Amino acid sequence: MTTTTATPRGFGYRHPQFRLAGLLAAPMAWLVVVYLGSLFALFLTAFWTVDDFTGQLVRTFTLKNFQQVFTNTAYLSTVVRTVSIALLVTLFALVLALPLAFFMARVASPRWRPLLVALVLTPLWASYLVKVYAWRAMLQPENGVISWFLQPFGLSGPGYGFVGIVVTLTYLWLPYMVLPIYAGLTRLPNSMLDASADLGASGGRTFRSVVMPIIFPSIVAGSVFTFSLSLGDYITAQIVGGKITMLGNVVQTTYVTNLPFAAAVATIPVVIVLLYLLAVRRSGALDNL
């Protein structure tokens, strides 16, 4: 005859929800204190000002900084320019990513797909500054690689400026658009494409009516990355932008002498991204991601 001894079960075993809370306590504390805390400090500082005589912070509520941004033509044009660059980068990244991701997911053989994914990821392993300075060498107005290649045709490269920023940022963030679309295309059943062809739909009609609705959440996910990363970038504009500046450059040049104004400028990309995420959430584009 055998006897069994009851194993005592602790409080955490009887209440798994408390075990889950214990596991999440540390990362949630980090998120609240470091991430949300820094955002709160940023928003709070944006409503302060600086004494013109002493240069000290004046901790009184004011909208002066935001009024200066949206009433000063130079700052307002910088806001419009930054948003335009982010939109163009997202658009060009999408145009390049769609055929590339489609080839990787639907045309290339399964044995080559891991290699193609690795090739897309390879630029992310290189230093950000190395990649930007490489594009600086290519975009040089006189001795750059692009100008050297176009000279026999009587053309010249874009040089430094608006176009250089868009081209460089598109290269930097392209993998963030390719990978979500590739993941979405791998989930596309072959039976749906076959059914569309059997019903007499052309390739373009199949792409518009079958493929696009399925990969649209993936496109939105990729656009969140490319749009938000472009909005907050300032190093690329500093290296290949010439005289063109973005919001990040304004923050960089003003935070030492006027921290509240720099904080107000820094809140603009944050608010724009939050509004974009809210619109995406309300549209339900990410529900099936």
Per-region residue spans from a language model:
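Periplasmic/extracellular loop-to-transmembrane helix junction in inner-membrane transport proteins
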Residues: 47-87, 109, 155, 253-259
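Membrane-interfacial helix termini and adjacent extracytoplasmic/periplasmic loops
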Residues: 10-13, 130-170, 204, 241-242
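Non-cytoplasmic
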Residues: 42-51, 130-132, 176-180, 218-252
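Transmembrane alpha-helices
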Residues: 25-37, 122, 171, 177-190, ...
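Short membrane-interfacial helix/loop motifs at transmembrane-helix boundaries
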Residues: 3, 36-73, 138, 142-143, ...
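Interhelical loop and adjacent transmembrane-helix boundary motif
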Residues: 4-9, 14-19, 51, 63-74, ...
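N-terminal signal-anchor/first transmembrane alpha helix
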Residues: 1-44, 113-116
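Transmembrane-helix boundary motif in ABC transporter permease subunits
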Residues: 11-12, 88-121, 191-193, 278-285
